[in-house]
Design a protein with these regions (language model features):
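N-terminal pre-P-loop "Q-motif" helix
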Residues: 7-21, 873
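Amphipathic alpha-helical segments of tetratricopeptide repeats
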Residues: 402-406, 441-445, 478-483, 516-526, ...
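Sensor-1/coupling segment of RecA-like P-loop NTPase cores
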Residues: 153-187, 192-196
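Conserved phosphate-binding/catalytic loops and adjacent sensor/switch elements of nucleotide-binding enzymes
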Residues: 40, 45-136, 145, 175
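Tandem amphipathic alpha-helical repeat scaffolds
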Residues: 335, 383-389, 418-430, 454-470, ...
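Extended alpha-helical scaffolding segments used for macromolecular assembly and cargo binding
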Residues: 31, 45-49, 135, 146, ...
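Short secondary-structure boundary elements
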Residues: 35, 40, 201, 205-213, ...
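Helix-turn-helix DNA-binding segment
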Residues: 793, 817, 859, 863-906, ...
Length: 936
């Protein structure tokens, strides 16, 4: 790159370093921050690198925020996405298109139903789309001037980007906003983060810059003094030289000149030279977030504005481009504003409040122009907070709401308290739970209105639920209900929240009472969405109590579009419906619905909902036997929940991931995850999460042939669930593992009553998964008591139930038990075929520990299987292949991997003495195996 700009003199090495850094392909995402003192040349290097990368066909999204824009929500993010071509936007789902349009203020926020997560996800989607064609550079000049909402979005975006070719280049002033640097480092990881610290320029570079910028050559003694006074800072050196007369240059060797030192003194001296008109223009521009010539003319007498604009442009204070009037350097704007008196600024902001169009900027000018608390100003700020929230600018909404509280007159207590509660809600939404808690705990003791107090207590209960302690959250809900009076909506919201907490704490009867009270209030409200939600909440609790599935509810409430505003994902009607399908063994329907809901959540950028849906999808996939997908979805749900910072919920996502890893036989990983979940669950006293994570540890021990250790972990869980009346057999799926552990320990007398109760409930409810597991456990009990024939019949009955429901792992467990029994009956061929089929399934889905059990049993049979005939799996594969199916088609038909089909074909050819697919087809025809295929 040819560096010829005056501003880049002496900085060629830094520019080359930057460009080399961005040519690296890993790691991604990459973030580089140019750090240095004000005026040291950060922006010049940034501009050069940005221009060069654009020339190298990078997609560049850039913004140059100023300090005056820092109060405007999404101002920087709007600059980043402004100018995107229509094709980029058309690739987004409609909700995300509306989110981008909202950032650009092209749509009414009341019509867009946006969340901050939706805004963030839309931006990520844009970046990902652009990165598919060429690398993307997110370029920000003056990181410290980012508005909070844009900063929130950018950090969130970088967290979501993994392997995409995306990089970030930003500038930041030394000794300021180090927190932002640390947050960037934590987001992209140390390996993808670098800081370029700018050093002072040399004497020669400073001299050449002054010569080329001001067309003067400083005598060497004066150049040395200017260099020392500026500290090698080019901006400061130019400003010092600008203040010296040419006569001073000529006489510099004859007398000592007063050289101004320090930025404030230098800039002050330069601004002192402006006329009154130019000073007024500069002040108006410094107070505006985005100064324009029209606004300056509106704020000042026309003649003053005209003269002043000409002068400030000639003197290099402002750069006028069309209607835009931008300061030549951000330091000039700060200096102009800082020199003005408080009264002067107050009057100016009051005047500007009547001129600007943006609602948020207007209200901030009103606030800055107020002499004392003013209800008109406070009400405007509160309304602006609502508008910002509707745009998804939740951080900006929190800031505006805080300002509204500050500007509310002290005698208007109810208004002040109302706004404090709103502020807490916005802070909680933005992820600042500590700030929300402090605000609520400070406000609640002063609340005289019972309705406000109940609302505040309900919000505090949500804070406790997500971050602290579930029993305490329940107590806060009860306190909120006690004071709710005749406010049905507060009661309804609190009852629904309390229902979920109590069911999670395994107070099922209490949960049912709360759910039924909520349903009654929902009917009284006439709100159809709330009625649907409340009916499904009650149906869920009744299901957990072992009362089965309310078929009327399930047939009437299938609509996937019934979403309730401001409700958490776990009680949204479509999600509740899908979870009930999962728990009641409607696996195919549940999976399809969960996948649709997941896509919808992503389209709207609702990652909290997406994580909850993935948690259930991962659990379901483990039950089905799609273990690799289960791990992928469990891991992703854990990642999102971690970033959301909701501590107690994290224990559930950890469980789902751990469960999948345990079934894959990854002992160390699954144990670590389950113990992590247990630690969180015990801290928050999240009883259900304790049960789930402990159950994973018990399953690991059972998989390792350590039944005594499994029993030690699982037995207390069974007692706990029985005591809580959470007796739905398909809900926790723990009891069959405990029964197997007891039988393996020789404790048949303890296993028998548990099994009888389990079988009775399974039969009563018609729960297929429980009927299959119960039949297997019955067979294990009969085998342990010395009745192998009975055991074999039970195992075959279990397989009949398995055939009604896709549960590859559980079916393979039953085949393993049947194979062991057949071996004990000395039915060698049948035992080998059954064990081989079980092994094939475990190998195909990845159940490593249980596959080892099969291999051990096959090893005990001894001999070779080559003359024992085909296993059932081999027969099905041979039949399909002889019928002309390809290996891939056969694999899809039997839900096997192509590799498994290939290995089975090798064994089939060896057993039958064949060498080709044609010979296999002929063999089937000759031996009339086609009839057997149809029968099977």
């Amino acid at each position: 790159m040819q560096v010829s700009s005056v501003d880049l003199l002496g900085r060629e090495r830094e520019v080359r370093w930057l460009l080399d850094r961005f040519e690296e392909t890993t790691p991604r995402p990459l973030a580089v921050v140019i750090r240095g003192d004000p005026g040291i040349g950060k922006s010049s290097i940034w501009q050069a690198a940005v221009a060069e990368l654009a020339d190298r066909s990078w997609n560049v999204l850039k913004c140059r925020p100023t300090e005056s824009e820092i109060q405007l929500s999404f101002s920087a993010l709007g600059d980043l996405v402004d100018g995107l071509d229509a094709d980029a936007l058309q690739t987004l789902p409609p909700p995300q298109q509306r989110a981008i349009e909202s950032i650009l203020l092209r749509v009414d926020p009341e019509d867009s139903l946006l969340t901050w997560q939706g805004i963030h996800y839309a931006f990520v989607s844009v970046v990902r789309h652009l990165s598919t064609s060429k690398p993307v550079l997110i370029a920000i000049d003056d990181l410290q001037s980012l508005d909070a909402s844009s900063e929130h979005a950018l950090v969130s975006a970088l967290r979501r980007l993994n392997d995409e070719p995306v990089a970030m280049l930003a500038t930041i002033r030394s000794s300021r906003e180090e927190k932002k640097i640390l947050e960037l480092a934590q987001t992209v990881g140390q390996s993808g983060f670098a800081i370029l610290d700018l050093e002072p320029l040399s004497l020669e570079a400073i001299g050449e810059i002054i010569e080329r910028r001001l067309d003067v050559i400083l005598p060497r003694p004066l150049a040395v003094r200017v260099w020392h006074a500026s500290g090698g800072n080019p901006f400061l050196a130019i400003e010092i030289a600008r203040l010296l007369d040419r006569e001073d240059f000529r006489s510099a060797g004859e007398r000592s000149l007063p050289i101004p030192t320090g930025l404030d003194e230098v800039l002050g001296a330069r601004l002192d030279r402006l006329s009154d008109a130019a000073s007024q223009v500069s002040l108006v521009a410094s107070a505006l977030s985005r100064p324009t010539t029209q606004l300056i003319h509106s704020a000042l007498p026309s003649a003053v504005a005209s003269r002043g604009l000409i002068e400030v442009e000639e003197r290099g204070i402002l750069k006028v481009n069309g209607t835009e009037a931008r300061f030549a350097h951000p330091l000039l704007a700060s200096a102009v504003y800082a020199r003005s008196s408080a009264e002067q600024l107050r009057q100016l902001h009051s005047r500007l409040a009547d001129l600007v169009d943006d609602v948020e900027e207007r209200t901030r000018h009103l606030a800055l122009g107020a002499k004392a608390p003013d209800e008109r100003v406070a009400a405007s700020l509160a309304q602006a907070a609502t508008t910002a929230y509707q745009r998804g600018a939740v951080v900006g909404a929190a800031e505006l709401s805080d300002l509204a509280v500050t500007h509310t007159p002290p005698e208007l207590k109810n208004e002040s308290h109302r706004r404090s509660i709103d502020s807490a809600v916005y802070h909680l939404e933005s992820g600042d739970a500590d700030r929300a808690r402090r605000t609520l705990e400070t406000t609640i003791p002063h609340l005289e209105s019972s309705a406000l107090r109940s609302e505040a207590l309900n919000h505090l209960a949500h804070v406790q639920f997500h971050d602290e302690d579930w029993p305490d959250s329940a107590k806060l809900c009860e306190a909120a209900l006690a004071g709710a009076g005749d406010n049905p909506m507060i009661k309804l919201a609190t009852l629904q929240h309390l229902t979920q907490i109590l069911s999670a704490l395994q107070d099922m009867r209490g949960a049912l009472r709360c759910g039924e009270d909520a349903l009654r209030l929902a009917h009284e409200s006439g709100n159809e969405a709330l009625i649907v939600q409340s009916r499904l909440v009650v149906a869920t609790v009744e299901f957990m109590l072992g009362r089965g599935l309310d078929e009327d509810v399930m047939s009437e409430l299938q609509d996937e579009d019934t979403w309730v505003d401001m409700s958490p994902a776990y009680i949204q009607p479509p999600v509740l419906y899908a979870v009930l399908l999962e728990w009641s063994d409607h696996f195919d329907h549940a999976s399809a619905r969960l996948r649709r809901l997941y896509k919808r959540a992503l389209d709207y950028g609702n990652e909290t909902a997406a994580a909850h849906i993935l948690f259930h999808l991962s659990e379901l996939e483990t039950w089905v036997g799609d273990l690799r997908s289960a791990v992928r979805h469990g891991k992703e749900s854990h990642r999102v929940a971690t970033h959301a910072g909701h501590v107690s919920v994290l224990a559930f996502h950890t469980y789902a991931w751990a469960l999948a890893e345990a079934h894959l036989g990854r002992v160390d990983k699954s144990r670590a995850l389950a113990n992590e979940g247990l630690e969180v669950a015990r801290k928050t006293r999240a009883t259900v999460a304790v049960v789930l994570n402990t159950a994973v540890l018990g399953f690991i021990e059972l998989s390792l042939d350590r039944p005594a250790e499994a029993h030690e972990l699982l037995a207390p869980l069974i007692e706990q669930l029985t005591s809580a009346e959470a007796i739905e057999p398909a809900l926790f799926r723990i009891l069959p593992n405990e029964i197997e552990a007891l039988i393996s320990c020789g404790l048949m007398d303890q296993a028998e009553p548990l099994l009888e109760t389990f079988e009775q409930r399974a039969r009563k409810l018609g729960r297929v998964s429980a009927l299959a597991a119960g039949a297997r456990c019955r067979g294990q009990l009969e085998a342990a008591r010395g009745y192998p024939e009975r055991a074999g019949n039970d195992f075959r009955r279990a397989l009949e139930w398995h055939d009604k429901l896709t549960q590859h792992f559980e079916r393979a467990r039953t085949l393993l038990s049947l194979g062991v029994t057949e071996r004990r009956l000395k039915r060698w061929a049948s035992a080998r075929a059954t064990l081989q089929e079980s092994l094939d399934v475990f190998e195909n889905i990845g159940g490593a520990l249980w596959a080892e059990k099969d291999r051990a049993q096959l090893g005990r049979l001894g001999g070779s299987s080559s003359d024992e005939g085909l296993t059932p799996t081999e027969q099905r594969i041979a039949s399909l292949v002889s019928d002309g199916k390809s290996n891939r088609e056969t694999a899809q038909a039997l839900n096997l991997s192509v590799k498994t089909v290939e290995s089975n074909l090798t064994r089939i050819y060896r057993k039958l003495g064949l060498r080709s697919r044609a010979q296999l087809a002929g063999h089937f025809a000759k031996s009339n195996l086609e009839a057997q295929r149809r029968t099977t």
